[in-house]
Amino acid sequence: MKNIVFDLGGVLFARDKSKCTPELLEFFSFLRTPRMPLFWEEYDRGTSTLEEVTATISGMTGRPVETCAAVLRLAVDLQEPVKPTERLVGDLKAAGYRLYVLSNMSREFIDFLRRFPVYGLFDGEVVSCEEHTVKPEPRIYEILLERYGLTPSETLFIDDREMNIEAAAALGAYGITFSLHNT
């Protein structure tokens, strides 16, 4: 194995639940499903805006748009590195592995996460909002493999969604389904 590819949300970064208000935890309950809702997937794809997503969530929840916008801002601001994964990234880099990011992520989230020092340890990235394709669609994996000249059989994907690992395996790569409960 030469290349290790990390997902971001739920693998390298997460909201510390002890810092989240009950409202925030309840607000994002729609994300705790095997597949993301279509409106959120389009947000990650970069084909819908923060304003559109905020309006959709407002309509779903009956909460004012301003409240939904504030909760979304808080959701971004509370992202922080998952300490065991952050240490693993550092250890793998020190051991000479090539490290990459492959993540479904909106512009607001990725711009915030790129500010963390651990992000500088990666050799490359493919982020859904910049490529207009999302996992588990094969194209986003192909972009990563082609852009960085990665051989699938030498590449390990770490993701918190089984369907994304299955998509990597379909291209000949290896995968580990990650769980924050095991950190």
Model-predicted regions and their roles:
Residues 1-37, 41, 45, 59-63, ...:
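Active-site neighborhood of HAD-like aspartate-dependent phosphohydrolases
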Residues 2, 106-183:
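Asp-based, Mg2+/Mn2+-dependent phosphohydrolase catalytic module
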Residues 5-7, 14, 100-104, 159:
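Short beta-strand segments
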Residues 19, 23, 38, 52, ...:
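Alpha-helical elements of Rossmann-like donor-binding domains used by nucleotide-donor carbohydrate transfer enzymes
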Residues 20-21, 53-57, 72-75, 109, ...:
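Hydrophobic alpha-helical core bundles mediating ligand binding, dimerization, or RNAP-core interactions
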Residues 64-68:
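Short, charge-rich amphipathic alpha-helical segments embedded
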Residues 69-100, 138:
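Short, acidic loop-to-helix structural element flanking the phosphoryl-transfer center
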